Regions:
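C-terminal outer-membrane beta-barrel translocator/porin domains of Gram-negative envelope proteins
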Residues: 1-108
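Transmembrane beta-strand segments that form the barrel wall of outer-membrane beta-barrel proteins
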Residues: 13-25, 79-84, 115-125, 150-160
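Residue-level detector of the transmembrane beta-barrel scaffold of outer-membrane proteins
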Residues: 14-16, 50-54, 95, 114-118, ...
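Solvent-exposed loop/turn segments connecting transmembrane beta-strands
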Residues: 23-31, 86-90, 127-133, 156-168
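Outer-membrane beta-barrel transmembrane domain signature
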Residues: 46-48, 89-106, 114-139
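Hydrophobic alpha-helical segments
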Residues: 99, 103, 124, 145-149, ...
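Internal helix-turn-beta structural module
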Residues: 134, 138-150
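Outer-membrane beta-barrel "beta-signal"
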Residues: 142-144, 162-173
């Protein structure tokens, strides 16, 4: 991780990789491995305006139950759709945000405040499936980082299925 701000980055890059193996004790035939990863780029355009590009994916091997497949949808990877809207053996997504972020100082709170416009797309794959269907969502929102200790955003997303308002909280531990 090499970013200028760990809560609301304006420049830098972050890599996230995870592997998990699950073996069901009462049924040895139900075991699977789950692999996920993403890369986040934060590209400054002009002062206070940056582009955030997040590309990631996940896949599962073995014999998982359907509810253990990777998901697509919601505030984490495909805004404009409800959370976990799509499931598949393999998932790929790309999230793009244009951000305007400025410092905020007041008697009540110091931190950062900003506006965001986004365009997300993603796809799931299942064995013996040939849809070629990519799902897209777009929208706008506001973000707030009170005292620079946590990151909240509220977005209004639009897709061909729904128009959800989504709230996210991110905090570094």
């Amino acid at each position: 991780m090499a970013v200028d701000d760990s809560i609301v980055p304006l420049s830098g890059i972050i890599f996230n990789v995870n592997a998990r193996y699950t073996h069901q004790l009462n049924d040895g035939h139900k075991s699977f491995a789950n692999f996920t990863g993403d890369v986040e780029f934060f590209i400054p355009i002009i002062p206070k305006i940056s582009l955030a590009v997040i590309t990631g994916g996940a896949t599962v091997t073995g014999t998982p139950a359907f509810y253990q497949y990777p998901t697509l949808g919601g505030g984490n990877n495909l805004r404009g759709f409800i959370r976990d809207r799509f499931r598949g053996k393999t998932v790929f997504y790309n999230s793009n945000e244009l951000r305007f972020i400025t410092n905020m100082r007041s008697y009540l709170m110091n931190g950062k405040i900003g506006l965001v416009a986004f365009f997300d797309n993603g796809r799931v794959w299942m064995p013996n499936e040939n849809s070629g269907n990519w799902h897209t969502g777009y929208g706008a929102g506001i973000l707030l980082a009170p005292f620079n200790i946590a990151f909240f955003d509220v977005t209004y997303g639009v897709s061909k299925e729904s128009t959800p308002i989504q709230i996210r909280l991110r905090k570094k531990l």
